[in-house]
UniProtKB/Swiss-Prot annotation:
Membrane topology note: Multi-pass membrane protein
Cited SUPFAM superfamilies: Nucleotide-diphospho-sugar transferases (SSF53448)
Name assigned to this protein: Ceramide glucosyltransferase 3
Residue positions of motif D3: 302
Record keywords: Glycosyltransferase, Lipid biosynthesis, Lipid metabolism, Membrane, Sphingolipid metabolism, Transferase, Transmembrane, Transmembrane helix
Keyword Transmembrane helix attached: yes
Active site as annotated: D302 (proton acceptor)
Record's function text: Catalyzes the first glycosylation step in glycosphingolipid biosynthesis, the transfer of glucose to ceramide to produce glucosylceramides (GlcCer). GlcCer are known to contribute to the physical properties and physiological functions of membranes and may regulate signal transduction. Seems to be the major active form in the nematode. Only branched-chain sphingoid bases like 15-methylhexadecasphing-4-enine are used for generating complex sphingolipids in Caenorhabditis elegans.
Catalytic activity: an N-acylsphing-4-enine + UDP-alpha-D-glucose = a beta-D-glucosyl-(1<->1')-N-acylsphing-4-enine + UDP + H(+); an N-acyl-15-methylhexadecasphing-4-enine + UDP-alpha-D-glucose = an N-acyl-1-beta-D-glucosyl-15-methylhexadecasphing-4-enine + UDP + H(+)
């Protein structure tokens, strides 16, 4: 056991208790009165995390920390940092699960005073579920909207699917756009430009072709958008529609656990983590940022939409209903390639992610916690690893049940097997992203500069 282990941990525990007490008091004073159902259980969830960072630690905590730092050796310092890092990951689990209970799956009331919505659907190719996905937008329960379908070519095989639905629902205002408009190196932005320029309504919903929309999904997003005058971006938490097969279950499990945890916790703590598969924006606010053409030089345009809007003082939120991805062509290998592509994007946009990305999953973080506690207080490594894994698995399973809001399409045993596969493959996906930084998306190959900007192709 480390010479200073017990005394240091006791000092940290005492000081942390005081800080938590001060934070709770400050939040209670700053939070306006709320309904009894939310004020007691979810008080902290309504306060942006950045406000908590303004709290000043007590003087004795600072003095104690300085004394500890003067006595620490490098190994002990690394162990303390490791313990704090993994403890924060434990808190992220709790925040994500609590916020999912608070924010997701609420009933939405109809409101004819809400503004109209222009729904932009960029489409490339088709799969067996495309008809079902597109039809869910033709049947959406919203009083005023238009559907704007964007194709690179009139020869795209998905064009006939859309035309068939336009004939089936002639009362729905739907238009087709072909060829796009080149405003940058991002093909999705180029594809959407004609539709964006012709949009009639003040709210823009960008929705990928693989998204199935609940009948009240657009209403839910518009209601969230108009809940605050400074709200300019509303996204749906990425999830998946129930489908048969191991590959579909693997994809659904990822979005219901690892991805869902970070997305929900990030939105709760007011971080920019927007995703573009189903996102609604105020056109006026977006035009203030230069319109979507201003983001044609970035591959992850959805993230930069959110960042620029936040920089201009606008708010963002998630809607009550998750985005239901419903592609029929998913496979484990293609999905892992997709996740690898996202890792490459994050590394290019936020280089410091290199320090965190490979350590935030279950088994790497479990090893960090086990060796940290072994060094600090002499606990055996194996029991810590077992307890850590049980906690991680239990919280992931609980979060996925919350995201699902009903019975899962697979058993707990199947969930465990899929969960293990996902956790074991995560480090290899990260290594592949480091070794092969070039991004291949559909038929295009991209090279990114630090910061996420697309580099022009080499001649």
């Amino acid at each position: 056991m480390c010479k200073y282990g017990k005394s240091n941990l006791a000092a940290v525990a005492s000081s942390t208790s005081s800080i938590i007490g001060a934070a709770a008091a400050a939040v209670a004073e700053a939070q306006p009165s709320a309904s009894p159902s939310t004020s007691s259980s979810f008080l902290l969830l309504e306060v942006p995390f950045r406000h908590l960072l303004r709290l000043q630690p007590p003087p004795y905590f600072i003095a104690g920390t300085r004394r500890m730092a003067a006595q620490l050796d490098v190994t002990t310092l690394i162990a303390i940092v490791g313990f704090v890092f993994v403890f924060c990951l434990y808190l992220i689990h709790i925040i994500a699960l609590s916020y999912s209970k608070y924010r997701l799956h609420h009933k939405v009331k109809e409101d004819s005073s809400l503004p109209g919505v222009s729904i932009i659907k960029p489409i490339v190719g088709k799969d067996n579920n495309l008809y079902e996905n597109i039809e869910s937008f033709f049947t959406t329960q919203y009083h005023k909207y238009e559907l704007l379908f964007c194709f690179n070519s009139s020869d795209d095989e998905a064009v006939e699917v859309v035309k068939c639905l336009m004939k089936k629902y002639p009362k729905v205002d739907a238009k087709l756009f072909f060829g796009g408009e080149t405003v940058g190196l991002n093909p999705k932005i180029n594809n959407m430009m004609p539709a964006y320029r012709s949009a009639l309504y003040p709210l823009i919903l960008v929705s990928d072709s693989g998204i199935f929309m609940r009948s009240d999904g657009v209403l839910d997003m518009a209601t969230t958008m108009m809940s605050h005058e400074k709200m300019a971006l509303v996204t749906q938490t990425p999830y998946c529609k129930d489908r048969e097969g191991f590959d579909a279950a693997f994809e659904q499990m990822y979005f219901g656990t690892s991805h869902g945890r970070i997305y929900l916790a990030g939105n709760c703590m007011d971080f920019v983590c927007s995703t573009g598969m189903s996102s609604m924006m105020k056109k006026e606010a977006l035009d203030e940022c230069g319109g979507i053409s201003n983001f044609g030089g970035y591959l992850a345009e959805d993230y930069f939409f959110g960042r620029e809007l936040a920089n201009r003082g606008y708010k963002s939120a998630i809607s009550s209903h998750p985005a239901l991805q419903n592609s029929s062509s998913v496979s484990v290998s293609s999905f892992l390639d997709r996740i690898c592509r996202w890792v490459k994007l994050r590394i290019a946009m936020l280089p410091h992610i290199l320090l965190v990305e490979p350590l935030q999953d279950c088994f790497p973080s479990g090893l960090i916690m086990a060796f940290s506690l072994n060094h600090l207080v002499g606990l055996n490594i194996m029991p810590i690893l077992i307890l850590h894994t049980i906690y991680w698995f239990s919280m992931d399973y609980s979060l996925m049940n919350s995201m699902q809001n009903g019975k899962l399409s697979f058993s707990p045993l199947q969930f465990m097997l899929i969960w293990l596969l996902r956790e074991l493959t995560a480090p290899f996906v990260f290594i592949k992203a480091l070794l092969q930084p070039t991004i291949q998306w559909r038929n295009n190959v991209f090279h990114l500069a630090w910061g996420g900007q697309i580099l022009p192709p080499k001649c």
